[in-house]
Each structure stands twice: as C-alpha cells, then as structure tokens.
Amino acid sequence: MSTYLIGDVHGCLDELLALLAQVDFDPQHDTLWLTGDLVARGPASLDVLRYVRSLGPAVRMVLGNHDLHLLAVYAGISRNKPKDRITPLLEAPDADELINWLRRQPVLQVDDELKLIMAHAGITPQWDIETAQMCAREVESVLSSDSYPLFLDAMYGDMPNNWSPELTGLARLRFSTNALTRMRFCFPNGQLDMICKDTPENAPAPLKPWFELPRLVSPEYSIIFGHWASLEGKGVPEGIYGLDTGCCWGGNLTLLRWEDKRYFTQPAFKVEAEITNADEIAAAAKDPFSYL
C-alpha cells in the first residue's frame, strides 16, 4: 500500500498511465494524490477526467486554476480558448456528469496522519493550517452549490491580495482562490503578487517565492504543490515539494512515492501545448515556462 503524488497532468493521459505503470499503481490498495490542473493544453483532457473519476476513493486531488477555468467556460462565463484544447470535453455526452463531479472536488487536502498538505499553488505564508482549511471549505461550499456560477463569474481578478480575517463575501472567496490556485510570489509581508510569473532568480525585488517566507503552517507538515512548472521541482526548502515539471510543454510528468521519497518521471511523448500570442512568445524567449 503506497501513497503516490503526481504533478499537473494537463490532459496528458498517455504519460499519466505510463508513469503509473512504472510503479504498478493498484487503485485497490494504493492512493493517488494529484496537484490539480488535470485539464487544458494537453490532448486528452476528457479522457483524463474520465480516468481519474473512475478511480473513485483511490484518488485525492485538488482543483487547479485551469480546472476552475474549465468550470467557468462550461458555465458560459469565460471564453473557450483553442489552445486549451478542451472542446471535446465540453461537447462530450457525459460532460455534465464530469463537470458536476469536478466542481465537487476540494481545493485543499490535509492528512493529519501522513502530515501532508496539498494545494495546487501552495499555502500562503499568511495562513496557518486552520485558516487554510476554513477558507478552502468556503470555496468548496460555494463551488458545490447551485450558486457556483456567481462565484465563477467573480473569481477572476487579482484583488484583494492581502489576507484579513475581516474579508467577506466574494472578495474573501477570490483571495482564497488566488492563494490556493494561482499564487507564486509574495511581498515580504506575505501579500500576494499576482503579476510576476518569472523564475525566482529573475523576479524583481522585493518579491520572494511564497515558500521562502516564514510560514505559519507547522513544520511537522509537508506541503505538496504543482502550478509552477519553471521551478522543475528545484530550489524549494525541506518539507516543500513542487511536482509540476511541465509535461505538456515537453518536460516530464513527475511522481513522488511518499513512503520512501523516491521520484519517478515520465518524459513527455511530445510537446503538446502551443505558444500562440505575442506576449507568450516574448515570455517564452526569456523563460519557456513563464507564461504558465
């Protein structure tokens, strides 16, 4: 019985199955943790959702920003971008079932026995575990409710970017969503910066990666995150594990077996995502992952 943690899949089903075959994954006995962004950019978002859903209780996943964007597109709130390659999913006969299943998935996983915390982007240094769980439950509650389109319509935006217990309503939900699914850099006081997508060594002062700031989460807990492919899993402190290694961009899909902390990788079979606009082309010239 093993615990396997895998980074952002982004519609790369073949690589996911090949990686699981490397470790002889058995859903009857093993548990699979997924850092979110199951969909978009890769060729098989529909089949990834079908497969992950079929695993039932063997899966512990969190939603990523691309998963939330899919929900917004399906609800008619956001535009379907061709580069996301989700049209087959949107038009699938079981799309309603898959979308309703997806929106009932958590944005945070905490396992007190394994001392593991997982969120797509990480945990803001302004939160302790209890606050993170409270804010995650609030987001999950509205996503699973009939009023979820109202939340999806309001979730886009970078403000507020500073945590306060006094935040309420949609502003509070937007901060929590950004902290859990979009965060990369923070100011020294823990305030989120939602603009910079650079690598840590190229980020302007005084910005720091969220994991370099003092944290309120107990050091007894390890934090698992995805989202930040340009890190390639490197440069993070002890007890922090970044698992997005850019499979859909021609990198790898990475798996961490928790019991012995052994890594397994599956190289991308081909580059699946395309760089399509001037901003992305300019960013990619500086850093091929900066536009994620």
Curated annotation (Swiss-Prot):
This is Bis(5'-nucleosyl)-tetraphosphatase, symmetrical. Belongs to the Ap4A hydrolase family. CDD domains: MPP_ApaH (cd07422). It is an enzyme of class 3 (hydrolase). Gene3D superfamilies: 3.60.21.10. Its EC number is 3.6.1.41. It catalyses: P(1),P(4)-bis(5'-adenosyl) tetraphosphate + H2O = 2 ADP + 2 H(+). It comes from Yersinia enterocolitica serotype O:8 / biotype 1B (strain NCTC 13174 / 8081). One of its GO terms (molecular function) is bis(5'-nucleosyl)-tetraphosphatase (symmetrical) activity. The lineage of its organism: Bacteria, Pseudomonadati, Pseudomonadota, Gammaproteobacteria, Enterobacterales. Hydrolyzes diadenosine 5',5'''-P1,P4-tetraphosphate to yield ADP. It holds the Pfam family Metallophos. Keywords: Hydrolase.
